[in-house]
Amino acid sequence: MTKFWIGTSWKMNKTLAEARLFAEALKAADAGRSPDIQRFVIPPFTAVREVKEILSGTSVKVGAQNMHWADQGTWTGEISPLMLKDCNLDIVELGHSERREHFGETNETVGLKVEAAVRHGLIPLICIGETLEDCESGRAAAVLEEEVRGALSKLSEAQKQAEILFAYEPVWAIGENGIPASADYADARQAEIIAVAQSVLARRVPCLYGGSVNPGNCEELIACPHIDGLFIGRSAWNVEGYLDILARCATKVQAN
């Protein structure tokens, strides 16, 4: 059975002590996990090693929020894929809209990072999404296609067989003031993303939805045919919130 991916990125939040408390509580709840759901957490760099160590006896995957494409070199302030592997990480989040808006991330650099992640055995979680302006001007589908193709553009034919994830996060739906996309809208966009990715990879890859996911909409979202998981923000920064959404989704998945 195909698993649903449900996880959270903490962005620039949580001290090491807070990260440990979250990971320990998640580990304590491990006995109640659903076999249908693949859980993951993406802490800040300062906490990845400790969180991975605490969760090492569970099925929870742990990732990083970004990385450079080079293995090493004169890239002050950057983190390399080798460093992430040295921390025993599983996933790396790439191309988030905040990185694109504030730090000069482009489709080209995302493509370089995706190739480096695959080469080093990391699962790239590729974030894509249109702005409100794109949406209102009718360019959403074109923007998403450009981002998907750019992210996959550096992969060799062999690398195209690697495990790859997409996360659709409409820019207007994320953040504290984000407006959640309707389940129908999200599902339609994700169908387009999956189709474009399949045209490049010759297979279907999972596409998660992220954008103001919360306990009130998670069940409707996870029931959509083209939503293969949820990438949760602030609703899951508290471990009780994450466990609540996991439980709601597990019940919905089992009912289907």
UniProtKB/Swiss-Prot annotation:
It catalyses: L-erythrulose 1-phosphate = D-erythrulose 4-phosphate. PROSITE patterns: TIM_1 (PS00171), TIM_2 (PS51440). Pathway: Carbohydrate metabolism; erythritol degradation. Keywords: Cytoplasm, Gluconeogenesis, Glycolysis, Isomerase, Pentose shunt. Its EC number is 5.3.1.33. One of its GO terms (molecular function) is triose-phosphate isomerase activity. GO terms for biological process: gluconeogenesis; glyceraldehyde-3-phosphate biosynthetic process; glycerol catabolic process; glycolytic process; pentose-phosphate shunt. Catalyzes the isomerization of D-erythrulose-4P to L-erythrulose-1P. This is L-erythrulose-1-phosphate isomerase. The gene is eryH.
